[in-house]
Structure formats: C-alpha cells, structure tokens
Amino acid sequence: MSEAKNLLAQGLWKNNSALVQLLGLCPLLAVSSTATNALGLGLATTLVLVCTNTAVSALRRWVPSEIRIPIYVMIIASVVSTVQMLINAYAFGLYQSLGIFIPLIVTNCIVIGRAEAYAAKNPVGLSALDGFAMGMGATCALFVLGALREILGNGTLFDGADMLLGSWATVLRIDILHLDTPFLLAMLPPGAFIGLGLLLAGKYVIDEKMKARKANTRVSVPQLQDGYAEKAL
C-alpha cells in the first residue's frame, strides 16, 4: 500500500481520531446535536488541520526543537482565528450556533497531535494529506453522530443547513420522523455519550468481521494449493 493510501486508510478508519484515538471528545459531544453543526465544525477542523500540517511541515527545518510546541500553538491559533473570521463573515448563523467551540479548535488534541507526530517529520504534501484524512475521519464521525441525534431527537435531517450552505440549502431539510415532542435524551449530553458508544461498538463489530474474513481467506488459499498439488501427483 502506498503512503498516500495508507494515510487515507489510517485517518478515515483504522486510526480515526474520534472513534479510535478518542481525541476531541468535548466538541464531538457538545456540537453534534444536529448534522449541520457537526458538519460545520468538522469541516472547520479539517481546514485547520490541513493548513497547520502544511505550515508546520514547511517550517520544520527552521524550528528549534526546544521551542517547537509554542511555535506550533501560535501557528494553530493563527489558522483558527482566520477560519473563525471566515465563518463569521460567510456563515454567521453557523458561527452563532457553534459559539466558543470554533476558537477551542486551538486546544484540540487532534491538531497539535498531528503537527507533532507527523507534520514535523514528513514532507509538505504528505503532511497536508494526513491533515485532510484525519480531519475527514473526525468529520465523518461528527456527522454520523449528529445525524443520529437529530433524527432521534427532532425527527429531521439537515435542519438549519442554510446556516452552512446558504439560503438555497433550506430544501435539504428532510422530515424523517413525525414527533409530537422532541426526544430530549437524544439531544442532551447523555444522548451524545450513548450515541458515541454505539458508534464505537459498531466500528468494533465491523473490524472484527473484517479480521475474520481475512483469516478465512488466508486459510483457504493453502488448502487450494494443496489440492492442486495432489491432483498433479
């Protein structure tokens, strides 16, 4: 497997920052009340990861190891401030909805972790790809959890999508369940923990099935080879 494919596989599934490393749980649980909020924060985090990894990788040869962490934090804070201003300018409704969790991306362990563990040791292109893969992995986990909570809590999907995509996105709203009253458990923090637990369990089941399938394939290949050898004799 090439390095690029390995980075994508690690970021999106095998080493998913939310479902495997369990990093950034504070925004994951707090913002994932709707699919729109989850998608907005996930995309913002992905953009920060890509830009931060690129900058750290480009400057890695000139940053003294003794002061690298403060410099990384300064880079991350600069990128997050820029992203925050962009969201404020072009998606003000989403900016109000996400609130403090946009600037809190600075303290997200995913961002500083990838800068230190990968970007500081690898070329710019691969570092940017690593940031993209890790960000999209976190975004997918956020979106699935947000969609699950929104459907169970309000019976809708993509409610408030216009805050992220503009006024045309109001047509994306889907009424899936017709609830007389909202299911508050799904919308409150306990529902977020339960939903995350279900996602973790689902990933574990899928991983175990994939391992079993690979094991069966490895066992069947030698048997076929032995059968051909017996026929040849």
Curated annotation (Swiss-Prot):
- InterPro entries to which the protein is assigned, alphabetical: NqrDE/RnfAE, RnfE
Q: What is its main location?
A: membrane
The answer on whether this UniProt entry bears the keyword Glycosyltransferase reads no
| Membrane-crossing segments per the record | 18-38, 39-59, 69-89, 92-112, 128-148, 182-202
Instruction: Tell me which EC number(s) this protein carries.
Output: 7.-.-.-
- Please give the biological process terms from Gene Ontology that the record holds: electron transport chain
Provide one Gene Ontology cellular component: plasma membrane
Topology class, membrane: Multi-pass membrane protein
Q: Which UniProt keywords apply?
A: Cell inner membrane, Cell membrane, Electron transport, Membrane, Translocase, Transmembrane, Transmembrane helix, Transport
> Which Pfam families does its entry note?
Rnf-Nqr
Whether Disulfide bond counts among this entry's keywords is no
- State the superkingdom: Bacteria
Q: Where in the cell is it found?
A: Cell inner membrane
Report quaternary structure and partners: The complex is composed of six subunits: RnfA, RnfB, RnfC, RnfD, RnfE and RnfG.
- Protein family (similarity comment): Belongs to the NqrDE/RnfAE family.
Q: What is its biological role?
A: Part of a membrane-bound complex that couples electron transfer with translocation of ions across the membrane.
What's the protein here called? Ion-translocating oxidoreductase complex subunit E
Encoding gene, per UniProt annotation: rnfE
